[in-house]
Design a protein with these regions (language model features):
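A short, flexible beta-alpha/helix-coil linker loop
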Residues: 24-27, 134-135
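Active-site pre-lysine segment of PLP-dependent enzymes
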Residues: 1-15, 27-50, 57-91, 104
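Short SAM/SAH-binding signature in class I
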Residues: 17-19
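Short beta-strand
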Residues: 163-168
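Conserved core segment of the aminotransferase class I/II
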Residues: 77-147, 151-156, 160
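Walker B catalytic acidic pair
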Residues: 23, 55
Length: 168
């Protein structure tokens, strides 16, 4: 699944305030090229929308470059970027994520957050810090193994005569 600009355009109503993008996408492995994202950005800008960009799988792409939506021209101030440590750093279950967004948005989020969450567990915060400081070798090892498995499944499907859209 890849969102097309014309499909987005036709789904926008006067009450639309934001678009949710989830890419790279699990389980399809779909990701979006810079050109495709720029076309989405044009629609977003034309309709004065925000984008909630769930990029939790940003490190788990193969054979293509991941393009982060807020890196596009004029999109940083329109994007609420969601990320986390569970996928790339194998910290599933730790439930430690982050948001990058304009202050107007993060200020409003904090007003709600303070009443529904105490804080992330201290151990998870220290683990995430350690992952950022010293975990890249482990990430690369996991990515290599995941890619080996991905290639095995792709080859097996093709050997059996099955068509497929290669996951990235």
């Amino acid at each position: 699944f890849r969102l097309l600009p014309n499909a987005l355009e036709s789904a926008i109503t006067p009450s639309t305030k934001a678009v949710l993008l989830g890419y790279p996408a699990n389980p399809t492995g779909a990701t979006m090229s810079r050109a495709a994202l720029e076309a989405i950005a044009d629609v977003v800008e034309r309709h004065d929308l925000f984008v909630i960009s769930d990029e939790i799988y940003d490190r788990l792409v193969y054979g293509v470059e991941h393009v982060s939506f807020p890196s596009l021209p004029r999109m940083k101030e329109r994007t609420i970027l969601l990320g986390g440590f569970s996928k790339a750093y194998a910290m599933t279950g730790w439930r430690l994520g982050y948001v990058c967004a304009p202050p107007l948005i993060t200020d409003a989020m904090m007003r709600v957050h303070q009443y529904i969450m105490m804080s992330a567990p201290t151990a998870a915060q220290y683990a995430a810090l350690e992952a950022l400081r010293n975990g890249e070798e482990d990430v690369q090892g996991m990515l290599g193994e995941y890619n080996r498995r991905r290639q095995l499944v792709i080859k097996s499907c093709l050997d059996m005569g099955l068509g497929l859209n290669e996951p990235h």
